[in-house]
Amino acid sequence: MLAGTSPIVAPILNRDVLLADLGYYFTAISPTPGTGILETASISTFALAEAAPVISIYNGNPVASSVNIYPLFIRLTVTQANAGGLTTRFTLTLDQGQRVTTAPAATGVLTINNTNMGSGNKSQAQIYAGTGLVTVAASSQRRIVGNQSFRNGGVVSVIGDVYQFNFGSTEQLDPMSLVETGTAICNVTYNFAPVVIGPNQNFQVQGWAASQGATQHGYEIEIGFVEK
């Protein structure tokens, strides 16, 4: 583990290099590069999405540790287009406890790695995605912290679409195409408020589309987060 007095080499104002240098930066990605993770089918309302989220991030650190998880970006690359959805919308929530009652198969357990091979820091995050992921009802503490449509105008997603969520910063913006109502591939990035996932707290990305049919989205997933 790096000592607190370790020299830091980082461009001025670049938070990510500094955090990676200290061993606090992690990525979570789909277990098989090039293969998408299918979400649950026929999720046409927010209520249905809460029971079967696209992504669930649980902070498994002990409460006494005060170690938080801070998502910096989430990138979804469409590998299977949905059928029938009039929009592609994502709602972001925070809640107490581990809401996952049924974890998905191994294909839905994201691979977590520290991006600094010189650091011994290990993540206590539990990050799941896709079909088979089931959660209990939200508690009275549940908070909606974000809500945004990424595809509009009655057009379903297109294989190759990239949907990126950036939290608390304008850094890491991918090339953007806001032509989200046509049938061409679109790369869409939106900024969201900073999110803090405390110990024994759960953060979820719930995807839903009005009139979505039995053919669901499939996504390659990449997440960058800080744990400290």
Language-model region placement:
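Beta-strand-centric surfaces of beta-sandwich/beta-rich domains
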Residues: 1-6, 11-228
